[in-house]
Amino acid sequence: MELLPQGQRNNTQVTFEDQQKINEFSKLIMRKDAIAQELSLQREEKEYLDDVSLEIELIDEDEPVQYKVGDLFIFMKQSKVTAQLEKDAERLDNKIETLEDKQRDIDSRLDALKAILYAKFGDNINLER
């Protein structure tokens, strides 16, 4: 059974190297999806952190605030919690930036592979989602 239109034949041979490139493309797509999901979670966490920072600033400075460390909550002064939240926000910003860099690298490699594979296979291959 052929998937080409009737009367059209596929004369393109798939070499081992071509198959390796197709497999790499598939792996990169899966990695990109995982990074996109992680990036979404980190951005959401950053939003929550920003919201909490704004709320903490409204609290009286002498009032102790519960701050989550691992699985437990400890009481800290408002100023220390604010400083810790700033450190956490900076850590998240760095993580988001790293993930975005990875995503850009994957996108550039995907574009290169698309160009190579479409040049060889033309309409005989579909690399779009």
Swiss-Prot record:
Q: Which GO terms describe its cellular component?
A: cytoplasm; prefoldin complex
Q: Which UniProt keywords apply?
A: Acetylation, Chaperone
Identify the Pfam families for this entry.
Answer: Prefoldin_2
Residue numbers carrying N-acetylmethionine: 1
Q: Which GO terms describe its molecular function?
A: tubulin binding; unfolded protein binding
Write down the CDD domains for this protein, in alphabetical order. Answer: Prefoldin_4
Q: Per the UniProt entry, what is one GO biological process?
A: tubulin complex assembly
Name the InterPro entries for this protein.
Answer: PFD_beta-like, PFDN4, Prefoldin
Protein task: Binds specifically to cytosolic chaperonin (c-CPN) and transfers target proteins to it. Binds to nascent polypeptide chain and promotes folding in an environment in which there are many competing pathways for nonnative proteins.
Q: How does it assemble?
A: Heterohexamer of two PFD-alpha type and four PFD-beta type subunits.
Further comment found in the protein's record: Present with 7470 molecules/cell in log phase SD medium.
Entries under PANTHER family matching the protein: PREFOLDIN SUBUNIT 4
Its family remark reads: Belongs to the prefoldin subunit beta family.
Protein name as catalogued? Prefoldin subunit 4
Source organism per UniProt:
Saccharomyces cerevisiae (strain ATCC 204508 / S288c)
Encoding gene, per UniProt annotation: GIM3
